[in-house]
């Protein structure tokens, strides 16, 4: 079962990302890697105290845009800086595809109870898309820039 899932999903997922990165790189273009996940509202019987987590390693280009956007426009939200998890993990999607290729990146975590219903899903999809759309022509995001990883 494990080997089947690795071959059917994990390998296909990572190979497609690598294929797209290489396609763009061959044209001297660089991507920004944006990974979106959700996290449970409780961990070890404790309520998690953040709404959205911004995870990053050592490239601050995209995280800075998101932190500034939320600070300016959505002070009611509790934003975690490398919470509820660390963005400094070797061999995750960000490390493997963005950090190792010098691509700007961010991993966004949304608390699951906020996106259970369609209205929450639509709200957070629009919310997360706004800083990206505002910065779609920001050339600094689409340049290769190698930052040494802080991943352990």
Regions found by a protein language model. Give the residues of each.
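Short amphipathic alpha-helical segments
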Residues: 9, 13, 62, 120-124
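Short, structured coil/loop segments at alpha-helix boundaries
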Residues: 1-3, 59-63, 143
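His/Asp/Glu-rich mid-to-C-terminal helical/loop segments that flank catalytic regions of hydrolases
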Residues: 116-152
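Catalytic cores of processing enzymes, dominated by hydrolases/peptidases
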Residues: 12-115, 150
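Active-site-proximal, glycine-rich beta->alpha crossover segments in alpha/beta enzymes
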Residues: 1-15
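Active-site oxyanion-binding pockets that recognize sulfate/phosphate
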Residues: 3-7, 52, 56, 118
């Amino acid at each position: 079962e494990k080997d089947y899932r690795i071959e059917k999903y994990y390998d296909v997922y990572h190979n497609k990302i690598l294929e797209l990165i290489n396609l763009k790189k061959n044209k001297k273009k660089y991507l920004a890697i944006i990974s979106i996940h959700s996290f449970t509202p409780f961990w070890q019987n404790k309520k998690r105290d953040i709404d959205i987590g911004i995870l990053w390693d050592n490239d601050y280009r995209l995280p800075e845009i998101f932190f500034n956007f939320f600070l300016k426009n959505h002070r009611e939200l509790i934003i975690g800086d490398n919470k509820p998890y660390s963005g400094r993990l070797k061999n995750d999607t960000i490390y493997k595809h963005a950090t190792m290729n010098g691509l700007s990146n961010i991993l966004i975590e949304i608390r699951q109870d906020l996106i259970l219903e369609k209205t929450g899903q639509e709200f957070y999809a629009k919310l997360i898309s706004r800083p990206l759309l505002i910065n779609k022509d920001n050339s600094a995001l689409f340049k290769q820039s190698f930052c040494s990883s802080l991943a352990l």
